[in-house]
């Protein structure tokens, strides 16, 4: 992996290129549908990709600090063939991902964050997720309302774990500092 990072006042930039070669990837496999699934080291994978992130802080009108972060990542997986007919978990890594976050402070007590993620996995599944958080700070307490997956998107993350649909949280934090 090799990368470049630039930080100056209210602007930041990160760029990284990487290459990873892995062998003996574990998957549950079988040669016919009558056989039980067996965990086996079955594959080799060569992965290359890059990540790019930009961030900018600024002030807008009567609002306090505003922050915009934008990121893009691209991953290319080269899978070597397996000798098994059936695989329980097809390797399904991220292929392309765009992220954007906008954080704004209304005043010294109120702030909000809007987060956007658009992703494409190697099985060509594409999805978009939007999250929102608003927080109110009073003395040592912070009360937040969090809305996750506002679009109620059905999608899976790492290891094909299905992620929850739309959900909301109320969070109360106390700082002992």
Feature names for model-found ranges:
Residues 8, 33, 43-47, 63, ...:
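Transmembrane beta-barrel outer-membrane domains
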Residues 17, 25-33, 75-87, 115-116, ...:
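Outer-membrane beta-barrel translocator domains and adjoining extracellular loop/strand segments
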Residues 121-123, 131-177:
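C-terminal beta-signal and adjacent terminal beta-strands/loops
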Residues 2-6, 52-56, 100-104, 132-136, ...:
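Residues on the lipid-exposed face of transmembrane beta-strands in outer-membrane beta-barrel proteins
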Residues 11-13, 24, 61-63, 79, ...:
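Intrinsically disordered, low-complexity acidic/polar segments
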Residues 1-45, 104:
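Glycine/serine-rich loop-strand microenvironments at binding/catalytic pocket rims
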Residues 17-21, 40-119, 173:
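Gram-negative outer-membrane beta-barrel transporters
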Residues 6-11, 61-65, 107-109, 136-141, ...:
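Strand-connecting loop/turn motifs
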């Amino acid at each position: 992996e090799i990368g470049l990072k630039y930080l100056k006042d209210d602007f930041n930039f990160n760029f990284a290129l990487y290459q990873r070669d892995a062998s003996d990837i574990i998957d549950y496999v079988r040669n016919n549908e009558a056989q039980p699934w067996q965990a086996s080291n079955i594959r080799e994978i060569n992965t290359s990709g890059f990540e790019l992130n930009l961030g900018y802080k600024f002030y807008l009108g009567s609002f306090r600090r505003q922050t915009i972060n934008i990121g893009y990542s691209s991953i290319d997986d080269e899978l070597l063939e397996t000798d098994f007919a059936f695989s329980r978990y097809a390797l399904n890594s991220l292929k392309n991902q765009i992220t954007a976050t906008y954080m704004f402070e209304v005043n010294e007590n109120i702030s909000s964050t809007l987060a956007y993620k658009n992703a494409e996995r190697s099985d060509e599944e594409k999805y978009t997720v939007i999250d929102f958080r608003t927080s109110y700070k009073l003395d040592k307490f912070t009360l937040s309302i969090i809305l996750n997956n506002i679009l109620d998107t059905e999608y899976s993350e790492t290891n094909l774990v299905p992620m929850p649909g739309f959900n909301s949280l109320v969070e109360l934090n106390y700082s002992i500092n």
